[in-house]
Amino acid sequence: MMNHQFSSLERDRMLTDMTKKTYDLFIIGGGITGAGTALDAASRGMKVALSEMQDFAAGTSSRSTKLVHGGLRYLKQFEVKMVAEVGKERAIVYENGPHVTTPEWMLLPFHKGGTFGSFTTSIGLRVYDFLAGVKKSERRSMLSAKETLQKEPLVKKDGLKGGGYYVEYRTDDARLTIEVMKEAVKFGAEPVNYSKVKELLYEKGKAVGVLIEDVLTKKEYKVYAKKIVNATGPWVDQLREKDHSKNGKHLQHTKGIHLVFDQSVFPLKQAVYFDTPDGRMVFAIPREGKTYVGTTDTVYKEALEHPRMTTEDRDYVIKSINYMFPELNITANDIESSWAGLRPLIHEEGKDPSEISRKDEIWTSDSGLITIAGGKLTGYRKMAEHIVDLVRDRLKEEGEKDFGPCKTKNMPISGGHVGGSKNLMSFVTAKTKEGIAAGLSEKDAKQLAIRYGSNVDRVFDRVEALKDEAAKRNIPVHILAEAEYSIEEEMTATPADFFVRRTGRLFFDINWVRTYKDAVIDFMSERFQWDEQAKNKHTENLNKLLHDAVVPLEQ
């Protein structure tokens, strides 16, 4: 049953095997850009390996606004080309993984004296529809003030003139990343998490490999490759320093936080994109019985590994909520969870964080190290295509075979083999029935079918196999089934991997995490044969994340 190529129980073997081959491409960084590049390259026939020093998607790729969006706000900066490319790309991302990405109608209210008026909103959304190639059923409509309040009664009534209504796509960024990575594994890619590149290896001034440290065991491995890509997001400049090539352009990190509230406190029924008092734009989005709101955009110069919410960040978002939804009187005590993430933007002199372009660029150093900088979640597939085209051309120049064009445009990602978006609901309905037949509640069966898509049978098989063990441990069987699946087929190596990135529960169901964490940690501890010290360390790490999700940095 185990997928040997992507089980965290196989990490040692995988790392040892890597030292015995020379790869066409070695990718440093296991976020969405690295995962997309691995899938593109492996599906063209390249031999690909990848290392990620934390967990997959642990950096920016699990901390976004969780929208595959068309970039409406970039029209304000007249970034027409970006809106056109990203908008079209959005539909492709959706079709290839409809279980992780879903259309979400967005309300854009406009008030007297706000950033957008009726005319600019209408024109802006029309241009957006045109540039982004929006399909007919999802084209924007304009609403009166009365219609706007029917869509969302909580919106500020004072000065309300109307609203725009258009489609965004909501996603689970971390699961999108892991599903892309799993599809890359199917094509033969070899990704390993918790493996840090300590240094680059050179021959005659050219980068020919990496020295990797397994962060969990402290063992070291030398791995060789014809081409090396730096897809480390916020860390790209650190790797360029190792390569002595950090000159010219560099990154500017900005931080964005999101707050999560229970629907009982913030009963939003409709996603809203709205003005803040200082002229920025913020999203409020209902999701799984919660409402989440963000984001901020502030220059960040602290440690990159664990950005935290500050009191100032928190208060800014709360003030924005109470400005647009004045009847709620939200306070800091209402916050159930939060997250903070970094945008790895390409520095532009004299620009405010919100004005800096989100475009991506590829830089090649004298040693041949290829760096991908900037970019957006939505554009990951296109970015990967550009990188792999460059790698293909360089390899061809050096006498290697031609690996041909990109194949990912109509390629479902792992879990996405459900017959396209039009068949998703019938697929989920059928699988929900199977889950109920296996003894699960309708709610749990449906949630599993949506989360795992066409891989859900692998989870259902484990529901059958783990019934006795679940009863013995006094934990619902589907939780053990998910945990085992994520260890054996999604390279989950720590409790945080499972609770934060494989299930998103630390953000969207934090009390569930508090309820089941000890039982899941016990289960994982036996699977990984952790000693007491290791088990305590993993427990402490998870408890710290639970604390940081609610308590700002200064408290």
From Swiss-Prot:
Gene3D superfamilies, A to Z: Alpha-glycerophosphate oxidase, cap domain, D-Amino Acid Oxidase, subunit A, domain 2, FAD/NAD(P)-binding domain
Annotated metabolic or biological route of this protein: Polyol metabolism; glycerol degradation via glycerol kinase pathway; glycerone phosphate from sn-glycerol 3-phosphate (aerobic route): step 1/1
Location relative to the cell: Cytoplasm
Top EC class, one word: oxidoreductase
Pfam entry (one): DAO
GO biological process: glycerol catabolic process; glycerol-3-phosphate catabolic process
Highest taxon of the lineage: Bacteria
Cofactor(s) in the UniProt record: FAD
Molecular function terms, GO-annotated: glycerol-3-phosphate dehydrogenase (quinone) activity
A GO CC term assigned to this protein in UniProt: cytoplasm
Keyword presence, Cell membrane: no
Binding site for FAD: 24-52
Main location: cytoplasm
Catalytic reaction equation(s): a quinone + sn-glycerol 3-phosphate = dihydroxyacetone phosphate + a quinol
Induction: Requires glycerol 3-phosphate and the GlpP product; repressed by glucose.
E.C. no: 1.1.5.3
Keyword Glycoprotein: no
PROSITE patterns listed in its UniProt record: FAD_G3PDH_1 (PS00977), FAD_G3PDH_2 (PS00978)
Keywords: Cytoplasm, FAD, Flavoprotein, Glycerol metabolism, Oxidoreductase
Family: Belongs to the FAD-dependent glycerol-3-phosphate dehydrogenase family.
Listed name of the protein: Aerobic glycerol-3-phosphate dehydrogenase
Gene encoding the protein: glpD
